């Protein structure tokens, strides 16, 4: 049995900025319309994966900021 190709496998390697830029492009294509149902579903799935990647980056940034604040200690 052949392994299925994941068209969204490249997303894990994207920076936040790259993922966000691609997400904006996907949303634009979906809003423009004109794509077939199959293409629209593929775009939607990619958009969901890109949004998850952005959330992962943002959550990582929140954790790093919290850790930095904890290391700095109370300022007051």
Curated annotation (Swiss-Prot):
Protein name listed in UniProt: Exodeoxyribonuclease 7 small subunit
GO biological process: DNA catabolic process
Protein family membership: Belongs to the XseB family.
Subcellular location field: Cytoplasm
EC number assigned by the record: 3.1.11.6
Alphabetic keyword roster: Cytoplasm, Exonuclease, Hydrolase, Nuclease
Catalytic activity: Exonucleolytic cleavage in either 5'- to 3'- or 3'- to 5'-direction to yield nucleoside 5'-phosphates
Role noted for this protein: Bidirectionally degrades single-stranded DNA into large acid-insoluble oligonucleotides, which are then degraded further into small acid-soluble oligonucleotides.
Main location (coarse class): cytoplasm
NCBIfam families according to UniProt: PRK00977.1-3, xseB
Molecular functions per Gene Ontology: exodeoxyribonuclease VII activity
UniProt xrefs under Pfam families: Exonuc_VII_S (PF02609)
Xref: HAMAP family: Exonuc_7_S
Quaternary context: Heterooligomer composed of large and small subunits.
InterPro entries, per database record: Exonuc_VII_S, Exonuc_VII_ssu_sf
Enzyme class: hydrolase
Lineage: Bacteria, Bacillati, Actinomycetota, Actinomycetes, Micrococcales
Gene name of the record: xseB
Entry-linked SUPFAM superfamilies: XseB-like
């Amino acid at each position: 049995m052949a392994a299925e190709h994941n068209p969204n496998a490249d997303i894990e390697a994207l920076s936040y900025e790259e993922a966000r830029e691609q997400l904006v492009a996907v949303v634009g294509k979906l809003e423009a319309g004109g794509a077939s149902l199959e293409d629209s579903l593929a775009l939607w799935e990619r958009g969901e994966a890109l949004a998850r990647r952005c959330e992962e980056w943002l959550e990582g940034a929140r954790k790093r900021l919290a850790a930095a604040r904890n290391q700095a200690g109370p300022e007051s």
